[in-house]
């Protein structure tokens, strides 16, 4: 809802998004509006909607990446404890959380808008942050990274022991393999999170900040 006069104030206040005019609008309208057009140009609304959708998408990408990564760490430590071996040391988990996860998540917040961002229907106000299949994606991606990491630990342990056997206690080779595998999986997973709808190979442009976070 847009308006500039005092009579528009009730409608602007009750609308999901009330927009007031910054130049010709009254003070009453500006005070109750959710957004004020400083240039009174309706075309600015289009740019504001696109930017709002980009920010919301990027928040979902960062949250999805962090939760899937942390889920894989929690599940890996939990199941390895049940099986009687140590998957990762606390210092490994600290490094992954502070270095491997932190910078790619920040880089995902700077992702460019996707090409179809303005062709999507409006999002319902009742939709949660995990709607649209994001919750399911987090679950299966976290489980997948966990399985890959634990398999790499077993392979490293078998290489150290010289034969196939279930690990017990602490295996330096297995722990090294698990640490490197989980770190690389989460780094590549950050590229996977650039879009929930499109393949990373079909996205136009590059997120230079994400590449810098990976190489760093």
Segments (PLM) and residue ranges:
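Acidic, Mg2+-coordinating phosphoryl-transfer loop and its flanking beta/alpha structural elements
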Residues: 1-32
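Short, mixed-charge, low-aromatic patches
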Residues: 4, 211-212
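Membrane-embedded transport module
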Residues: 20-200
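Cytoplasmic-side transmembrane-helix entry/capping segments in multi-pass membrane proteins
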Residues: 201-211
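C-terminal substrate/ligand-recognition segments
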Residues: 216
